[in-house]
């Protein structure tokens, strides 16, 4: 997996190897980061990446098609497979049962050329989930709780494995939200089992043929264990200037905000968007607040249009952005001077 912020250098390195076609089962080049054309450079990069994809047997996802991790989950994620990507949030794929790792462009180029990707053998941390999320508590609160306990350095050199009865209460998009932000833990990767919920997601995508059940061995030994009762979690938010500076929303209630941005590879699934539409229905965005919403993929955008949720968002006064990374990587929607921005993104 590559994207256009890191892909240009990765493909220059790949072409320098002189390999005629990629030797991976599948390689995908996504254009989702630098999608605002303020000058010729971004478009030149997109044209270059597209030409490399055509020449070397790489799938090409054009601008506006969606955020790489959301689209990859929908179209290409396969339980039990390995994935490396030139993007730190590649572990999103762990939500579908992949070992997905963010890597450098050179490492990804070497892998596409048939070379080996080496990592130091990671420690494995078991996160045992019990109970069920209460109303208004989301999957984001699960990973925020992990960050609160372990810190942004707590996952370095480790793979986070989610287990327990609570796993069965989480959909694939919710699991992907949690594994996505394993990057903020500094983890090598994060992974969920592949079960009937995974199969249901793949059936909805018309890809049930790639499903395989995967779970931890009953006698598996872990380097660390963390227990989280989902029923005890409350709505939380990460405050400036670190994802592990987590506080319950009750401590933030009443704070005046200037901007709300919803989307990114962490929270742009159909499930996330339908929650937003439900909250906005029959309401109007406050005149002093700017609300921007970026669906994670064309698939999500089309489904929102079909079920009326998109109209609900527009009627409420939301600005609908392109299906891309957008404000998360600073591509537009900068807040006002000394403004307070509330975002569903994985970085703050």
Q: What is the role of each PLM region?
A:
Residues 1-348:
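Fe-S-dependent hydro-lyases/dehydratases of central metabolism
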